[in-house]
Regions:
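An acidic-aromatic loop/edge-strand motif
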Residues: 1, 77-117, 222, 435-437
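Extended carbohydrate-recognition surfaces in non-catalytic/accessory domains of CAZymes
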Residues: 1-40, 73-74
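Aromatic-lined ligand-binding clefts that engage carbohydrates, nucleic acids, or primary amines
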Residues: 2-3, 24, 32, 36-59, ...
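Extracellular acidic, Ser/Thr/Pro-rich low-complexity tracts
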Residues: 34-36, 49-51, 93, 161, ...
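Phosphate/dinucleotide-binding and metal-coordinating scaffold of catalytic cores
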Residues: 47, 439-440, 445, 512, ...
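Activation on beta-sandwich/Ig-like modules and their edge loops
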Residues: 54-78, 83, 109-266
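Extracellular and organelle-lumenal recognition/adhesion modules and their flexible linkers in secreted
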Residues: 263-442
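Glycan-association/targeting regions that enable binding to alpha-glucans and other polysaccharides
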Residues: 266, 425-588, 592
């Protein structure tokens, strides 16, 4: 990127030249010198424009633009010459207003788009795949009721005809993921829906992702959905009790943002869970009893409403209530609940309005599984009362399943009176045969292929941000938002190349500065979309300056970038065992980038801090690491021996790289399965932990490793042995504190 000028479109321009009124047109010229070569040069004009401008580059008309506010215009600059070049503008006032304003910044772009091409052409859309149930919720194990875990084979696809005429489906078929041929005479009425289920087609819809194609009688591709089970795709459709619903028939069915998990929250019913147990630990256990608490937690990601929580000692006689806040009526909606600790994977839980309109409830939300002393919702018993192993305790609460896992575990610390309840879920899932509940009046523009360049900019070097944008209504505006060091958001217009690729330029910054950005696109019907989808809550980040990483003599280099506040929370010792995943950006070998990856600390509590810290990074399946892995581990404990038995080249607490060498030898010599480890130089998200050489662990003992090692090794349930670690004090000695 080569800046030719600067402007801040948020600030109304101060007139430098006051133009005389009443003119039919105004003319401007700007010359600049250029040396060097560019394979695909483009000129980007961004700023404020009121009127119509004709742009001439070296005497050739290259673009015309009409605007009443901020604008972005990307122009083919193949006429770029060594030496002097001339940009000329002809500004024509709008007929409806005598005002003319021109305050544009120009940047020269290299125009490279090979890393992220424009979106493919829109599919015909005469009939669309409108809803998919590819992984119905299973039957969950419930030993108390003698129910074993069982997968649910039910699968179905819904087609929708959004047109005004019926469509003859004779000879049409599904291909790739499943095989199904529509019979002769099959019709889909105008505005109608048609469902094909697993009893009709051959093959299955893969739970981890598949490509579903619909072809007409001439074998032309009518629609295509390359769905996945996670990442940018709605995770709740993967056995979480929801289906994939298209948000609008004209939305691009190939993109994850065009789909949403069906909303099942209105279908589930309240239920009351009540059971009794003594205060004794399970026979043969030696669990700690230092804390006196009631705990709730999901065994996987899930959501439920909770109300009327009660733990009663001697329920038939003394009836002593031990829960201090079981109704949540004194709490503030949108915040945490008084006397409760909502931690780790359950940290997004909050008080909500009762769906019946009266009172308040706890919206218990888990991003992943609960654990024995953290990553749960917990509350200290009234008066910090210790449990009596000979007394009876009655535990009761109301629950209403909302989404995800229905496996809700309740217990008294540590593992007394423990029970996992399978919350009741609605029998019907999704909206087969009818309009989607998540359908929008109009979907915003489709965005794909976001990338900033250079990935690791030097000080003062402008950064180009580009992505592909498309919309059937046409694009009205694309705006690039950016924040410097978590400061106030600023904006700059983006310009298109006429082929669906849009560009914006961010100003250069000093070494060490960190910039977060996202794009807002609005179509001509007024619908808006953000990319990454979370907008300001997403994490597309770059840091200025190399930080010495490129000079390291390690083949693989990885940079993990987080907002400072997020990184501080990630490494906060109080929350050291949290498994909540924070959004981040990952750059690998300064060539590949992942925005909105997810990271948490890993290892046992004592291995999550200092020079032993490790990171578990999760990538979306739409862009796996090295084309295969959806999660990796960076093990900061790194030991490298000299190799001659005389000591270490690098030494810290933890395993040596010799283990990697032994695995590699065994794998090559005897085809013995290995966990595919490597060495990486890792740039940590903050200086406190220090950049370092580290072990890059890829498969570990995940399903891909088990599949290579054993026949059907990834099938069934994987059990993990876990040692019991527990805190012995709080920050201030108060048992209700952290």
């Amino acid at each position: 990127n080569a800046p030719l000028g600067t402007a801040n479109p948020l600030t109304p321009p101060t007139p430098v030249t006051v133009l005389p009124g009443g003119r039919p047109a105004y003319f401007f010229r700007k010359s600049f010198a250029w040396s060097g070569t560019m394979p695909h040069p483009r000129l980007l004009l961004t700023g404020i424009l009121k009127g119509t401008v004709e742009c001439y580059f070296n005497g050739v008309l290259v673009a015309t633009e009409t605007s009443r506010q901020t604008t972005g215009l990307s122009i083919n600059a193949t006429g770029l010459l060594p030496g002097a070049n001339l940009v000329a503008l002809k500004l024509i006032p709008a007929q409806a207003s005598p005002d003319v304003v021109l305050d544009l910044a120009a940047s020269l772009l290299d125009g490279t788009t090979s890393v992220a091409p424009a979106l493919p052409p829109t599919l015909p859309g005469t009939v669309v795949v409108n809803e998919i149930s590819y992984h119905a919720r299973p039957t969950y194990a419930n030993p108390a009721a003698a129910v074993a875990f069982a997968d649910n084979p039910a699968e179905w696809i819904e087609l929708h005809n959004p047109g005004t005429l019926p469509v003859d489906l004779s000879g049409w078929r599904f291909s790739d993921a499943i095989d199904y041929a529509f019979p002769a005479g099959a019709q889909l009425t105008a505005g109608g829906f048609l469902v094909v289920d697993h009893t009709q087609f051959s093959g299955t819809l893969a739970n981890r992702g598949d490509r579903l194609r619909l072809r007409d009688a001439t074998d032309a591709l009518i629609d295509e959905v390359p769905y996945l089970d996670d990442g940018r795709w709605p995770e709740l459709a993967d056995g979480g009790g929801s289906t994939l619903e298209l948000i609008h028939p004209r939305a691009d069915r190939r993109l994850p943002e065009s789909w949403a998990a069906s909303d099942e929250t209105g279908r589930s019913a309240w239920q009351t869970i009540t059971y009794r147990a003594t205060g004794a630990e399970p026979t043969g256990s030696n669990n700690p009893d230092i804390w006196h608490e009631f705990l709730l937690g999901f065994l996987d990601g899930g959501e439920a409403l909770i109300d009327d929580v009660s733990v009663m000692e001697d329920p038939d006689t003394a009836k002593l209530q031990l829960i201090q806040n079981g109704s949540f009526e004194g709490d503030t909606i949108g915040l945490g609940a008084a006397k409760w600790r909502l931690l780790g994977t359950h940290k997004t839980s909050k008080v909500a309005a009762h769906p019946d309109g009266v009172g308040k409830v706890l919206h218990l939300a888990a991003t992943a599984a609960a654990e024995h002393t953290y990553n749960t919702a917990s509350t200290t018993l009234a008066g910090n009362r210790a449990l009596n192993p000979t007394k009876t305790y009655e535990i009761s609460f109301k629950a209403k399943w909302l989404a995800g896992s229905p496996q809700l575990n309740s217990r008294l610390y540590l593992n007394r009176a423990a029970r996992t309840t399978i919350l009741s879920q609605p029998a019907l899932t999704g909206t087969p045969g009818s309009a989607n509940g998540r359908r929008l009046a109009n979907a915003g523009p489709a965005c794909e292929g976001l990338r900033h360049s250079p990935l690791v900019p030097a000080a003062s070097l402008p950064v180009r941000v580009s992505l592909s944008i498309a919309d059937p209504d046409g694009l009205a505006e694309a705006t690039l938002f950016y924040s410097l060091n978590q400061g106030a958001w600023q904006r700059t217009p983006m310009g298109g190349d006429g082929a669906g690729r849009y560009f914006g330029v961010l100003p250069g910054q000093v070494t060490g500065a960190q910039v977060q950005f996202y794009v807002q696109a609005t179509d001509r019907a007024g619908a808006t979309s953000l990319f990454p989808e979370g907008g300001p809550a997403s994490r597309a980040i770059y840091k200025v300056g190399d930080g010495g990483t490129s000079a390291q003599t390690v083949r693989n280099k990885m940079r993990l970038m987080m907002n400072a506040a997020d990184a501080a929370e990630l490494h906060n010792p109080i929350h050291g065992v949290s498994n909540f995943r924070w959004p981040c950006t990952v750059i690998y070998n300064d060539r590949e980038v992942w925005y909105d990856a997810k990271v948490r600390l890993r290892s046992a509590p004592f291995g999550r801090q200092g020079n032993r810290a490790g990171w578990n990074i999760q990538f979306g399946p739409e862009h796996p690491f090295r084309g295969v892995q959806t999660s990796i581990v960076i093990d900061g404990a790194f030991n490298m021996p000299k190799g001659d038995g005389t000591g270490w080249l690098e030494n810290s607490l933890g395993p040596s790289v010799n283990e990697m060498l032994y695995q590699a030898i065994a794998n090559r010599a005897g085809d013995i399965p290995a966990t595919y480890d490597d060495v990486v130089y890792f740039q940590t998200p903050r200086p406190t932990e220090g950049n370092r050489r580290a072990q890059l662990k890829m498969t570990r003992f995940n399903p891909s490793y088990l599949e290579e090692t054993f026949a059907d090794g990834a099938e069934g349930t994987l059990f993990k042995q876990e040692l019991i670690y527990f805190p012995t004090t709080t920050v201030d000695g108060n048992p209700e504190s952290l």
